[in-house]
Amino acid sequence: MDATKKWTWKDTVVLFILPVELTVGALLNVLGLTKNQLLATVLVFLIFFTGFLTAVILKRDLLAEDFRKYKQHFFKNFGLSILGAIIFGGIILGGRGLFQTNQAFSQIDFTASASLSTVVPIAISGIIPLMAPFVEETVFRYELFYRWKDTKWVKIAMLIVSSVLFGLAHYNNYSSVPILMLPMMLAGAALAGLYYWRGNIWISLFAHFIYNAAFSFFPTILLIFIQLAGGK
């Protein structure tokens, strides 16, 4: 492990963000709070927003330090982030094609009528994926991989562990079928490799952010526009 960045209570808290989010999300379903779409979406947003704030606040030193370095060669680094997003997306979409799945758009209903009860949940749902990279990159790419970069065999083991856990963390996106999570695991390994190569968390974070924006946020905006334009 990097001797200059010793493990602290903050790292422990960051590791528990995702398990807490998944547990609370499951409790919402058990308690029947997901029956109301608007209420469920707002509650899920609050859960993810809390996780986002926790990760950003507790890892602000890492994020601030790496962002200063990122800005020094912004166009080069952003270009690498775009390339990373393409590779990340290519692995995921290639895997979906291989397994003949279409989770990226299967839950989008372009025929739903426009109303406050439908547009608001859709809008909120489009924002949530933009917060996810901040938590997932600090957890899977930094805490569970990059911290261990100076220990050869542990580094390799943590690359596998972090990538597998990254894929499993998205089980809800793939109908809880493990084989369908394999492309996400490989995509996570690709982001870890990008982070290791350049030594800057923002390169992988922006790559993840760009992918989520392209396949979640912008389709959501398009859906809202179509519904509102339809005047229904």
Q: Residue locations for each model-derived region?
A:
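Alpha-helical transmembrane segments in multi-pass membrane proteins
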Residues: K5-D61
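Juxtamembrane helix-loop-helix connectors linking adjacent transmembrane helices
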Residues: L33-K35, A64-A132, I224-G231
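Alpha-helical transmembrane segments of multipass membrane proteins
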Residues: V20-G25, I47-F52, G84-I92, F166, ...
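Transmembrane helix-loop-helix hairpins at the membrane interface
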Residues: P121-K232
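Non-cytosolic membrane-interface motifs at loop->transmembrane helix junctions
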Residues: K35-L43, Q107-A114, V177-A189
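Residue-level signature of transmembrane alpha-helical entry/exit and packing/kink sites
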Residues: K10-V14, A40-V44, H73-S81, V120-S125, ...
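Juxtamembrane/transmembrane-helix interface segments of polytopic membrane transporters
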Residues: L22-N29, R96, Q100, S216-Q227
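N-terminal juxtamembrane cytosolic/stromal segments of multi-pass membrane proteins
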Residues: M1-W9, L62-D66, S176-V177
